[in-house]
Amino acid sequence: MPKKAKPTGSGKEEGPAPCKQMKLEAAGGPSALNFDSPSSLFESLISPIKTETFFKEFWEQKPLLIQRDDPALATYYGSLFKLTDLKSLCSRGMYYGRDVNVCRCVNGKKKVLNKDGKAHFLQLRKDFDQKRATIQFHQPQRFKDELWRIQEKLECYFGSLVGSNVYITPAGSQGLPPHYDDVEVFILQLEGEKHWRLYHPTVPLAREYSVEAEERIGRPVHEFMLKPGDLLYFPRGTIHQADTPAGLAHSTHVTISTYQNNSWGDFLLDTISGLVFDTAKEDVELRTGIPRQLLLQVESTTVATRRLSGFLRTLADRLEGTKELLSSDMKKDFIMHRLPPYSAGDGAELSTPGGKLPRLDSVVRLQFKDHIVLTVLPDQDQSDEAQEKMVYIYHSLKNSRETHMMGNEEETEFHGLRFPLSHLDALKQIWNSPAISVKDLKLTTDEEKESLVLSLWTECLIQVV
């Protein structure tokens, strides 16, 4: 699932260190997807359905099943991840819980069969063959370059974190009980066939994962087989279960998921604190104290609810005329945890500025625009009440692919720059122009103009054209 979901497990062999990056490129030939842009990638992923049709009729509304009889696409899907890939992965140091789970659905419940510490391929294969266990591999984009390439483009397209998990299930077995997720799900069938059953949501657009009892979910509203090259989409909250029928080969599919905690409710929570902060500067009513002992009351008082209702109406009126919304966490959280740009080489172009040094007479343009956010926040280096606003630019060019979606909060750091609020208009010029002359930037002095573009160039955010 997207969003820093920390895998659980009892890895006791020396706290596992972050895995080293590997390139396990599959021999699937040229890509069957169009990577020219984020939108072209998504369009090719859901082909032949048109993007407009998808968002009008299916997104957050109902499942979409795309069954294809395309050998080339089936071969490409099969190159994304195979059961046999686990052997080379395990040789690099994979841990139960963190990287891999072994489980099986028994009497409607998930039974976890993990061992402690490192996962060894022979043990995984033994549990797979003898116990009919499903192998779940967490976030394979950390190691499989083509999944990195796909998910990086999808994160640009959705503006939301995109995670993935691989599920490998032997014949005559089911890994997970009926459940629903808190994410939008795209299933790509990679190997073998899988039997799927989908049910009406009990909680539409659910915000939490939950297992559902068979007797509560009724009869499936959709039932079908997925074959290599097929794609299935369903909204968060859709109850589902899947099994590999007896007598067939094992099944491998990858679940690509997004839009966790990315609702209007989440955005409201994220922006309202900044709105209150700004309004309180101008509205003395918001700065007056609450009644004595209000916090000691068991129930909300009529006075408190009436005052809060009035304040919310004031905030709504102010919001109507506001152009700048202060995002406190969502922007930073996304850009800080997302994948870095896909790079077929060593990634040097993302860490070392190249090309000409920008000068006053240069023409510059933004690069990696989908990997940068610009936001206005109170100065985080000031602790007093008179915090000035600053312009913050955060980017994901130096993010770690190896820790993507793995919940390593203590290892996460911001990458970016900070500028005075007076630089906002000039930065917007750079953001909104295909290319712009440095001397035309809306800053007072030539020194400020050169200093601004040099700072951006040093972070590999602009190039001279």
UniProtKB/Swiss-Prot annotation:
List UniProt keywords, sorted A-Z.
Dioxygenase, Iron, Metal-binding, Nucleus, Oxidoreductase, Phosphoprotein, Ribosome biogenesis, Transcription, Transcription regulation
- Has keyword Iron? yes
| Induction summary | Up-regulated in response to MYC, in alveolar macrophages from coal miners and in silica particle-treated A549 lung cancer cells.
Cofactor binding mode and count: Binds 1 Fe(2+) ion per subunit.
User: What protein is this chain from?
Assistant: Ribosomal oxygenase 2
User: Which EC class does it fall in?
Assistant: oxidoreductase
Binding-site positions, Fe cation: H179, D181, H240
Q: Which SUPFAM superfamilies match?
A: Clavaminate synthase-like
Enzyme Commission designation = 1.14.11.79
Recorded catalytic reaction(s): these are:
L-histidyl-[protein] + 2-oxoglutarate + O2 = (3S)-3-hydroxy-L-histidyl-[protein] + succinate + CO2; L-histidyl-[ribosomal protein uL15] + 2-oxoglutarate + O2 = (3S)-3-hydroxy-L-histidyl-[ribosomal protein uL15] + succinate + CO2
Any one annotated GO CC term: transcription regulator complex
| Tissues in which the protein is found | Expressed in liver, skeletal muscle, heart, pancreas, and placenta. Not detected in brain, lung or kidney. Expressed in several lung cancer tissues, but is barely detected in the adjacent non-cancerous tissues. Also highly expressed in several esophageal squamous cell carcinoma (ESCC), and colon cancer tissues, and in various cancer cell lines.
Location relative to the cell: Nucleus; Nucleus, Nucleolus
Point out residues bearing the modification Phosphoserine.
S309
Gene encoding this chain?
RIOX2
One GO MF term on file is: histone H3K36 demethylase activity
Q: Which residues form the JmjC domain?
A: 139-271
Q: Which cofactor does this sequence's record say it needs? A: Fe(2+)
Task: Please list the GO biological process terms of this entry.
Answer: ribosome biogenesis
